[in-house]
């Protein structure tokens, strides 16, 4: 697996594995091809992710997003927490839910 794809894979896995209060608050932004238009950016909520493997993010509706098309991960306030080529822009460890 290429370095860039493995970076994307690890970023998506990291967010999916954190015990966040509501993982639906996070989203993946990816490039989507539209016939006659070209590429447009689309967003998929993390709550719609069924699984991730080393090639793609698979959604509960059966669609797949190839890892090389993912450009960023956004947090609950719409802020970018990870961006392709830049890595982590925000420390997500402070968002971990603690056991009471």
Swiss-Prot record:
Origin superkingdom: Archaea
Stated family: Belongs to the UPF0248 family.
Protein name listed in UniProt: UPF0248 protein APE_0939
Organism per entry: Aeropyrum pernix (strain ATCC 700893 / DSM 11879 / JCM 9820 / NBRC 100138 / K1)
């Amino acid at each position: 697996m290429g370095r860039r794809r493995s970076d994307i894979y690890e970023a998506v896995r990291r967010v999916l594995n954190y015990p966040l209060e509501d993982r639906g608050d996070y989203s993946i932004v990816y490039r989507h091809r539209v016939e006659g238009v070209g590429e447009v950016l689309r967003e998929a909520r993390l709550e719609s992710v069924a699984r991730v493997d080393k090639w793609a993010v698979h959604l509960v509706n059966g669609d797949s997003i190839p890892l090389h098309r993912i450009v960023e991960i956004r947090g609950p306030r719409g802020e970018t927490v990870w961006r392709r080529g830049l890595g982590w822009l925000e420390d997500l460890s402070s968002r971990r839910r603690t056991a009471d």
